[in-house]
Amino acid sequence: MAHKKAGGSTRNGRDSESKRLGVKRFGGESVLAGNIIVRQRGTKFHAGVNVGIGRDHTLFALTDGKVKFEVKGPNNRKFVSIED
């Protein structure tokens, strides 16, 4: 005869895998065309000069150069550009 009451079950104990979002190349870093600069959900950062934007809003370099982050416009948007 068991002398311990059966334990209850739980509906917790799960978590999703991290998506590894964020800035991959910082301001002043050299990049080659095609390098990913920022992985993001939505446009937290906007594409500036020589920067392309992917289907999932990933920003990537269109040319070789140095990464430049800047805040501009009436809404203080963050832009990422590539300078030669």
Curated annotation (Swiss-Prot):
Presence of keyword Ribosomal protein: yes
Pfam family, one: Ribosomal_L27
Protein name per its UniProtKB record: Large ribosomal subunit protein bL27
SUPFAM superfamilies per the UniProt record, alphabetical: Ribosomal L27 protein-like (SSF110324)
UniProt similarity note: Belongs to the bacterial ribosomal protein bL27 family.
Any one cellular-component term (Gene Ontology): cytosolic large ribosomal subunit
Region (Disordered): 1-22
One Gene Ontology term of the molecular function aspect: structural constituent of ribosome
NCBIfam families: L27
Keywords in alphabetical order: Ribonucleoprotein, Ribosomal protein
Organism: Shewanella amazonensis (strain ATCC BAA-1098 / SB2B)
PROSITE patterns: RIBOSOMAL_L27
Record's keyword annotation contains Ribosomal protein: yes
GO process annotations (BP): translation
